[in-house]
């Protein structure tokens, strides 16, 4: 109704329709998003961006045929748009005969190519060369892209160390039993956490394939609820001495009310905000019945997978330097060791390699931990039509495969700085 009012007051334009489509797409209302993108296209039929936006919706819901149809139309209009080329590469497995590979390399080498476009091309070429098994050509492009990102977004790894120092200091005397009977008892979200590229999307897809579960993706509301309840900035940690029983109830109620409002229809909801493990102690006190699933993966494969992906600007800034990656990972291990000691029964850990080697055993373990009865369709997670917005969008739309295991062996010499950092 709000947008109907806006359209009556404002002159209808493609730009306005695109903005509304973006809002609905972000809210995972794919059909409504497509409706507004189509309205925009009626006004500007040659606008390449609209084709790309439609392609993005189709990719998120797993319709790769329409995805490629739309992105190819966008590329036909703007053949040298590197964002479109990157999108194309990330929407299918690239064969060695695909002309896009040499086209991207030509653009990469062109002097007039901007620094940012060269970064995008570096990651896109990496994906294309790996798909086509041209592994010996990969690393110069991958390293160039990461080095440039590291220059654009410098990161002091001491930030991760000091943040964990604070967590350990504030929760040094934490005992979950001290909070028995407190918090919001009715709240039971399922938090899926871990390092990026560790398999969290796969785990969420398996669990959310259950008829009683809605997969909400990366919600990120827990930090907001904590911040506005206790009066701290969203990402600032707080001492337990400032947390009162009524705070815990309010935090839990805020999170659960938000999830139930935005993701109605099922009794269980997953939140794949992967960094939530840092707030595990406080959230377990605020919601005694919430679940935490920590996904672990061989760090050599996990960190390589991080290194070969470009994240949203100003996020995961440790990702673009091998030494920083190793140090950050060791800090992840450090804080998980801390929580394992403080709340050993507060979460379960699942190993990515175990999951793909024996899917049913470990999928059943996950479903059982969530207090749900087993459903066979949890093993057919790739058939789910829910919208997915992560870098793993291609992988979780197909049955479990093992080609990503020991991928680090292809680049063993190039990754030596990383291996030394995680020793």
Feature annotation, model-predicted:
Residues 179-285, 295:
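Phosphate-binding active sites in nucleotide-utilizing proteins
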Residues 89, 101-116, 121-189, 236-242, ...:
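PAPS-dependent sulfotransferases, especially Golgi type II membrane carbohydrate sulfotransferases
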Residues 18, 22-25, 52, 59, ...:
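Position-specific recognition of the canonical hydrophobic site in helix A of tetratricopeptide repeat
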Residues 9, 43, 77, 110-114, ...:
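Structural marker of alpha-solenoid helical repeat scaffolds
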């Amino acid at each position: 109704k709000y947008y109907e009012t806006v359209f009556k007051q404002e002159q209808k334009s493609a730009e306005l329709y695109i903005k509304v489509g973006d809002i609905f797409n972000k809210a995972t209302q794919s059909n409504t998003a497509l409706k507004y993108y189509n309205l925009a296209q009626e006004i500007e039929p040659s606008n390449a961006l609209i084709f790309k936006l439609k392609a993005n919706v189709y990719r998120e819901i797993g319709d790769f045929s329409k995805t490629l149809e739309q992105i190819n139309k966008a590329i036909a209009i703007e053949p040298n748009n590197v964002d479109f080329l990157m999108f194309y590469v990330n929407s299918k497995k690239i064969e060695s005969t695909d002309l896009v590979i040499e086209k991207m390399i030509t653009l990469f080498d062109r002097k007039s190519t901007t620094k940012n476009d060269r970064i995008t091309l570096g990651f896109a070429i990496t994906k294309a060369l790996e798909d086509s098994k041209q592994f010996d050509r990969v690393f110069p492009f991958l390293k160039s892209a990461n080095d440039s990102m590291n220059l654009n977004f410098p990161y002091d790894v001491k930030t991760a160390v000091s943040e964990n120092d604070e967590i350990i200091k504030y929760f040094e005397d934490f005992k979950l039993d001290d909070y028995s009977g407190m918090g919001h008892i009715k709240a039971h979200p399922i938090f899926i956490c871990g390092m990026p590229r560790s398999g969290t999307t796969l785990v969420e897809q398996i669990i959310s394939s259950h008829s009683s579960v809605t997969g909400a993706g990366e919600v990120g509301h827990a930090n907001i609820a904590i911040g506005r309840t206790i009066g701290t900035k969203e990402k600032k940690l707080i001492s337990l001495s400032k947390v009162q029983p009524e705070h815990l109830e309010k935090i839990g109620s805020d999170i659960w009310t938000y999830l139930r409002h935005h993701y109605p229809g099922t009794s269980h909801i997953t939140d794949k905000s992967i960094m939530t493990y840092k707030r595990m102690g406080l959230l377990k006190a605020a919601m005694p019945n919430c679940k935490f699933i920590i996904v672990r993966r061989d760090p050599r494969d996990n960190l390589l997978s991080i290194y070969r992906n470009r994240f949203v600007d100003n996020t995961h800034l440790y990702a673009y330097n091998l030494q920083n990656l190793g140090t950050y990972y060791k800090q992840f291990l450090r804080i998980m060791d801390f929580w394992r000691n403080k709340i050993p029964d507060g979460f379960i850990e699942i190993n990515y390699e175990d999951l793909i080697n024996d899917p049913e055993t470990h999928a059943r373990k996950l479903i059982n931990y969530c207090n749900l009865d087993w459903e066979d369709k949890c093993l057919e997670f790739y058939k789910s039509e829910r919208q997915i917005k992560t870098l793993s969008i291609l992988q979780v739309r197909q049955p479990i495969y093992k080609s990503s295991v020991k991928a680090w062996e292809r680049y063993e010499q190039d990754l030596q700085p990383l291996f030394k950092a995680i020793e």
